[in-house]
A protein has these predicted regions:
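Non-catalytic alpha/beta scaffold blocks inside enzyme catalytic domains
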Residues: 1-256
Length: 256
């Protein structure tokens, strides 16, 4: 954001309620300062249904219902020359002058951000606009997505297994209605790691008490791809196990 001359927020409260707000605030503030040879501040356009911290800092704010954000994004995309888009409904309150000025500023370079509450269509348009204005690779960086190649509970129902290890969750309660959980685990050895004596714990042959996340070591990945260590805040109150410890024991690692 500190490099963008124009920022368009499509119902994205990046200063307040969105993820990584602390980083976005810092970068946005840098773009608003006239120093280090910079003579122009970044310009912020915000399209949103309610007042947010981002909207309060906007140079140009357009208030529309959440369902009309798609229409505004589509109109801006078509104004930038993106082909193959159909006109979407817009409220009468949207003025052509606002849209034209936003399009003109985006042509000079910028970045578009879509909020997590907006549908897939709005995010696709945001990516298309970023591609059109040359933001990909500069203001927008893509990172490898986390491994999503895990199976589903329906895959489990169709699989052949003897031992089922449940790490957290409560599938006995939350499994889809078309999955007969009792039948699925019939004759199987079920081991459950969890916090509570819930429905899945009742069905388990062996229940392992799980440590609270504030009691365990771990690792995580930030939004910019940085791997970080997670330290416990307190010593375990009880003699529980974390998910990593259980998996380590299964893998034959004596000490974690």
């Amino acid at each position: 954001l500190d490099q963008a001359s124009t920022i368009l927020s499509l119902d994205c409260d990046f200063i307040g309620g969105e993820a990584d707000a602390h980083r976005h605030i810092r970068d946005f503030a840098k773009g608003r300062k006239l120093n280090n040879g910079r003579t122009d501040m970044s310009r912020l356009y915000v399209v949103e249904p309610r007042m947010t911290q981002t909207g309060a800092n906007a140079d140009h704010r357009l208030r529309v219902k959440a369902g009309f954000v798609h229409g505004v994004a589509s109109a801006i995309a078509r104004g930038l020359g993106i082909k193959g888009l159909e006109a979407q409904p817009l409220p009468e309150s949207v003025k052509d002058g606002w849209m034209d000025q936003c399009v003109d500023d985006l042509k000079k370079g910028g970045v578009v951000m879509a909020g997590h509450g907006q549908p897939e269509e709005v995010h696709v348009l945001a990516h298309a606009i970023n591609q059109k204005i040359g933001a990909i690779g500069s203001g927008v960086q893509f990172l490898p997505a986390p491994n999503s190649g895990y199976g589903t509970i329906k895959d489990l129902a169709e699989a052949s297994f003897d031992v089922l290890l449940i790490l957290g969750g409560n599938p006995a309660y939350s499994a889809p209605a078309d999955i007969d959980w009792k039948k699925l685990i019939d004759g199987k050895k079920v081991v459950r790691l969890g916090y509570y004596d819930d429905e899945s714990a009742v069905d388990a042959d062996l229940f392992l008490a799980q440590t609270h996340f504030l009691e365990e070591w771990g690792d995580a990945r930030t939004s910019d791809g940085t791997t970080v260590a997670v330290r416990p805040l307190i010593k375990p109150l009880f003699d529980g196990l974390s998910e990593l410890e259980v998996l380590a024991h299964i893998a034959g690692v004596a000490k974690t």
